[in-house]
């Protein structure tokens, strides 16, 4: 099996050459996404890099701040940190932690993390988390701070994100869900808190292909896991879908370009594609070529 870091850097170079502007890295139980983003950002200076997204359970703000500031210094200001609530299944099954009060934990995590990444110090004592720096926690080179985004789609997480974060990273949320539910709730929360207009980085599962039926059937299997998670099931329904694959963007160049425009019109400030390898290398490259043209 090929070295994952080497393969990722190679793909990132290809993405830059295709005209893409950013590369985002998920976090599971394998590679450390902030480290991966830092390496890619150093090796491929034309790309913005980000993490989408680190669960707030099983992590501590002090450690995540160290990772994020190091990645920001390594990339000279091109790193973006995404956080997520995570799921009950992975939190309790993987970390052995009770999945309790996730919204309160997100609020405390963001509050402490903002202090750390902005000021290089923290003196936060909440109900669930404590983050205190007896010595400075600033990483030279990361003085500008780190953009904080949240994989938020529900009403409560959108409220917290609007108040405390710089934006959101909704996944499997189609244009209808963005326009009618997500964007209004997030924008209202940000305005009430006196915050700037938030970024809405729509994460879209999609690919350019001529074999639409077969690829959508394959996507149905790949994405079925998300249908078991209440927050995803809800946003899929809000998007007008029954299955997660109903929200996937699959079709020829004209179809995919039109869907990207729909996301933009619905309020997405950035559109990021995932799963572009599902139909093979030729269609992945075809997808990247289109997205590079749209980005240009």
Task: Please place each PLM-identified region on the residue numbering.
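Active-site-adjacent structural elements that line small-molecule/cofactor binding pockets in enzymes
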Residues: 1-296
């Amino acid at each position: 099996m090929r070295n994952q870091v080497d393969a990722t850097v190679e793909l990132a170079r290809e993405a830059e050459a295709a005209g893409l502007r950013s590369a985002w890295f998920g976090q599971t139980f394998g590679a450390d996404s902030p480290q991966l983003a830092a390496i890619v950002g150093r090796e491929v200076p034309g790309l913005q890099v980000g993490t989408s997204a680190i669960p707030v359970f099983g992590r501590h703000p002090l450690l995540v701040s160290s990772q994020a500031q190091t990645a920001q210094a390594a990339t000279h200001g091109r790193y973006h940190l995404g956080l997520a609530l995570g799921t009950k299944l992975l939190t309790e099954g993987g970390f052995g932690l009770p999945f309790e009060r996730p919204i309160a934990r997100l609020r405390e995590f963001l509050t402490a993390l903002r202090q750390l990444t902005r000021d290089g110090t923290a003196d936060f004592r909440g109900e669930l988390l404590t983050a205190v720096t007896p010595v400075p926690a600033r990483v030279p080179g990361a003085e500008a701070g780190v953009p904080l985004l949240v994989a938020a789609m529900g009403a409560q997480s959108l409220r917290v994100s609007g108040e405390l974060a710089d934006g959101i990273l909704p996944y499997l949320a189609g244009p209808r869900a963005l326009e009618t539910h997500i964007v209004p709730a997030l924008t209202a929360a940000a305005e009430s808190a006196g915050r700037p207009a938030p970024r809405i980085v729509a994460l879209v599962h999609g690919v350019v292909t001529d074999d639409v039926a077969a690829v959508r059937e394959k996507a149905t299997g790949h994405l079925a896991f998300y249908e078991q998670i209440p927050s995803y099931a809800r946003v899929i329904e809000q998007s007008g879908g029954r299955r997660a694959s109903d929200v996937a963007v699959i079709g020829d160049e004209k179809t995919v370009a039109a869907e990207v425009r729909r996301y933009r019109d619905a309020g997405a400030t950035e559109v990021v594609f995932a799963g572009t390898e599902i139909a093979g290398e030729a269609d992945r490259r075809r997808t990247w070529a289109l997205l590079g043209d749209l980005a240009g």
